[in-house]
Structures are given as structure tokens and as C-alpha cells.
């Protein structure tokens, strides 16, 4: 009663939020989580009801889908050019027109061993976002079944799916891949010069915010410039608040660009094959700061604890790996993570031996003198996996190497010719 009378909320919203809280507690009790993360002051809310008939009710009208919250009716609008959303709305409306018939058909097909997509709306969420200074509210509808394939205006598929193995070596900033038809070495999450431009702009804004914060709160700092300990009441000027809004908008645009770039890369990889082979993800481990046993070097200076946090934040290799797994498994493909003993970065097929290499050694020579790029060669060894997906197929390595090596040389020549800088690749373009 208190929830309804004091906050004007139904119990279904509390139930939905309780599930999120319990999921977070489970990560602390039974997984690698360490602490709970609460909403910050100023964060926009997300309203979700885990039932489509309570709280946020999903219904149909003459104009299309609508979401009802009490006496408030929210029409679902989208751009007319978005054919995928049009197809999705059409499928949801078809279910809402005859839900009993659609459910009976799905149960009948399941008894025959066939799983069909009903497009039943499960629940809805209202997500608030601030875009270019304006508050926008989006309706997220969770639908039962697989998403409809995207198409063009002439009804042809927007994305095509290939066949065959794709060996991918995913680094902190780059991705190297080898398939039956193409080899490649690219920067992760890059759309033009977006990352370099955003980094520069973000540094300038943060520097200006720091100057403003120090000018408005001079008593909060020691003589050496460090912040005093203890609880403090901070004063922020109007200029600081405007800079903070600019910084939030810049981070939002950078996030969107990273997500779009990664989805484009994953869709391209899916067009090359249907079996994605890679190593287990380790971005979370590389993101943490180093903790050396002896923190002091031989000269008496403190060792640096910096690792790959900034690169992983800008390039998001873990997000690419998660999206690849989701796309390949949902479109009839396979996602394979090789065992730790596979050691694609150490094997040399010309001498049939494992040779450890320094992390800084990006270009190296095989035992027979052939010069290869390290990341691409690792992706080639992942491509040459056996039928049980556990070990390297040495016969396949030897028989296909000449063809793939020529493609690798053509790829490096194209990178040098275009002048594109591939991070940590060892390829000099100037």
C-alpha cells in the first residue's frame, strides 16, 4: 500500500526492480562481483514492468502499437524509412489480433519438434535519454522469438551469411581474421578518425572542468594541489555545468559510434563464414591495473601499474566478442572458443614447435625465414582448427599456407598504400 499511495507505483515495478537487484547480489555471492553499483545523482530512470498486461500495457490501435500507463497512452513512433521496425511492428500486431490462435499454432508445432517465432510481446520498458540537450523517451519491447532479418527497399536481404571457418585473433585494439575468401587486419570500433577526435575533445573539456572546479573550490585542495580528505560540499559554476553537459553528449556520441562500428564489423565477419573461432575473452583481466610483487625497479623508482584500460575502453574488444557470439548463434552458425592449450600465438607450423614471443614483437620470422604479421598468423592458426575444435590441423596449415600468405602480403601492401594506421601491428605506413 505504501508503494502505491506514496510513490503512485504498482507492485509490478517493484518486482521488476527486485529481480535486477537480486541478479546483482548473485554476481557478488556466486560470481566475480565485488560491490553493488547504485544509480548516480542525475542519472535518468528506466521504468520496466515484467508483464505485458500490468503496469506498462502493450496494446494495438488503428495507428499501430501503443503503450498504456494508467490513463496515459504513449503511441510507438519510428522513422518511416526503418523497414525493420515496420516489419517487427507488423508481426507484433498480427499476434495481438489473434493471440489464442497464434499460441495454439506454436504449441502444435512444438509437439512436432518445430519451434516457431510467435512475436508475442513479453514486456515493455520506458528508457529516458538526453540527446543534444533534449529529453527523449524510448519504448523497448521485448518480443518472443528471433528478430526479423533486415531487408532493403527492393526486399533483398541487407546482410548475407557465408559458409566456412573464420579464425579471429582479437587484441586490445585490433582484430585479425582469416576466412576462405578474405584475410584482414583492422582497428576495432573505428569509424573514420572518431576515436582520435573524441579523445582530444574529451581531454580539452576535462581540463577546462578541472580549472573551473579548482577556481570555485580553492579550500578543498592542499598546497601541493591534491584534494583534501573528508566529506566536502562542492560548488559548481554555470560554466562548469555547461561543460559537463558537453562532456556527456560527447561520451554518448562516442558510445554510439563504437557500437555501430562493432556491429558493422560483426556483420561483415558473418558474411565470410558461419563458424567463428577465437580465443577465450581476456579483456576484463587486461583492463585491471598491474600489481607487481616487487613494486620498485632496480633504480629505486616505482613500477608503472598501467596496463590496457584505456585501449579497452576505446575499442571494446569484449563487446565485439559478445556480439559475434550472439549473431553467429542466432543465425544458425557456430561460435567456438579454443582451449587454453591451443596457443595460437606461439605455434610455428614450419618447425612444428611452440616458440614464446615478446608482446612487442609484432612482425617475426618463422623457422624457414618467412616473415609474417603476428596477429594475422594467429588468426590463420585458429582458422586451421581440426574437426573436433580442440587442436591445430597441421596438415591444413601446411597445405593452405602459400595461398593465405599471398593474401596476407596483398593485405599489408594495401594498408601501406592507403596510409591507414593499424594500431600495434608493426606495419609502417610512412
Residues covered by each model-derived region:
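Residues at beta-strand starts and edge strands
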Residues: 120-122, 133-137, 164
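Acidic carboxylate diad motif detector
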Residues: 1-131, 310, 314
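Positively charged, helix-rich recognition surfaces that bind polyanionic ligands
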Residues: 137-430
Amino acid at each position: 500500500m505504501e508503494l502505491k499511495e506514496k510513490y503512485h507505483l504498482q507492485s509490478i515495478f517493484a518486482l521488476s526492480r527486485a529481480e535486477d537487484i537480486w541478479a546483482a547480489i548473485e554476481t557478488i555471492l556466486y560470481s566475480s562481483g565485488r560491490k553493488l553499483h547504485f544509480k548516480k545523482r542525475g542519472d535518468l530512470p528506466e521504468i520496466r514492468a515484467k508483464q505485458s498486461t500490468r503496469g506498462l500495457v502493450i496494446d494495438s490501435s488503428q495507428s499501430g502499437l501503443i503503450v498504456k500507463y494508467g490513463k496515459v497512452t504513449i503511441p510507438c513512433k519510428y522513422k518511416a524509412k526503418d523497414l525493420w521496425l515496420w516489419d517487427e511492428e507488423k508481426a507484433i500486431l498480427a499476434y495481438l489480433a489473434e493471440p489464442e490462435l497464434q499460441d495454439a499454432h506454436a504449441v502444435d508445432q512444438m509437439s512436432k519438434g518445430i519451434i516457431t517465432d510467435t512475436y508475442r510481446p513479453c514486456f515493455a520498458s520506458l528508457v529516458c535519454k538526453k540527446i543534444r540537450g533534449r529529453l527523449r523517451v524510448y519504448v523497448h519491447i521485448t518480443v518472443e522469438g528471433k528478430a526479423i532479418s533486415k531487408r532493403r527497399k527492393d526486399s533483398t536481404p541487407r546482410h548475407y551469411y557465408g559458409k566456412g571457418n573464420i579464425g579471429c585473433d582479437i587484441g586490445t585494439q585490433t582484430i585479425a581474421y582469416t576466412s576462405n575468401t578474405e584475410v584482414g587486419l583492422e582497428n576495432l570500433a573505428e569509424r573514420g578518425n572518431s576515436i582520435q577526435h573524441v579523445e582530444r575533445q574529451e581531454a580539452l573539456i576535462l581540463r577546462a572542468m578541472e580549472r573551473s572546479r579548482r577556481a570555485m573550490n580553492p579550500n578543498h585542495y592542499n598546497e601541493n594541489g591534491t584534494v583534501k580528505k573528508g566529506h566536502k560540499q562542492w560548488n559548481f559554476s554555470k560554466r562548469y555545468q555547461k561543460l559537463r553537459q558537453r562532456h556527456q553528449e560527447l561520451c554518448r556520441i562516442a558510445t554510439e559510434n563504437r557500437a555501430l562500428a562493432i556491429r558493422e564489423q560483426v556483420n561483415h565477419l558473418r558474411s565470410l563464414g558461419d563458424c567463428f573461432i577465437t580465443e577465450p575473452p581476456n579483456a576484463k583481466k587486461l583492463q585491471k591495473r598491474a600489481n607487481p610483487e616487487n613494486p620498485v625497479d632496480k633504480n629505486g623508482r616505482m613500477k608503472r601499474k598501467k596496463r590496457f584500460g584505456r585501449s579497452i575502453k576505446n575499442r571494446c574488444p569484449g563487446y565485439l566478442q559478445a556480439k559475434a557470439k550472439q549473431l553467429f548463434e542466432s543465425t544458425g552458425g557456430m561460435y567456438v572458443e579454443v582451449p587454453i592449450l591451443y596457443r595460437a600465438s606461439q605455434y610455428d607450423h614450419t618447425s612444428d614447435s611452440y616458440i614464446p614471443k615478446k608482446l612487442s614483437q609484432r612482425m617475426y620470422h618463422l623457422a624457414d625465414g618467412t616473415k609474417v604479421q603476428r596477429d594475422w598468423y594467429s588468426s590463420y592458426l585458429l582458422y586451421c582448427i581440426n574437426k573436433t575444435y580442440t587442436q591445430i590441423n597441421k596438415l591444413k596449415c601446411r597445405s593452405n599456407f602459400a595461398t593465405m600468405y599471398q593474401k596476407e602480403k596483398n593485405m599489408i601492401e594495401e594498408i601501406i598504400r592507403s596510409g591507414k594506421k593499424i594500431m600495434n601491428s608493426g606495419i609502417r605506413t610512412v
